[in-house]
Amino acid sequence: MYSISTAGIDLIKHFEGCRLTSYQDSVGVWTVGFGHTGSDVRPYMHITEEEAEQLLKDDLVRFEKCVNDLVKVDINQNEFDALVSFSFNLGTTF
């Protein structure tokens, strides 16, 4: 079972960017931190950098599990990180 590496997290953070005040994304979903969405995100809420980091780590657990459950071939850490980043960005609903 893989876990996302520090480099993988840094890549996600780089492409997501960090917004400490919630905003509506391009499809109208309230988002905060490094791309965190969900019922806990309220309009114009404010979080700290530390809270944004924790939300990202908590969010990634679900995507790590999904990638670990679905990938049935040997992959390396970089490939795993890329798949977690991809699923974090696009979701895992089929």
Give the location of each predicted region.
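Cell-wall polysaccharide-cleaving catalytic domain and substrate-binding groove, primarily
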Residues: M1-F94
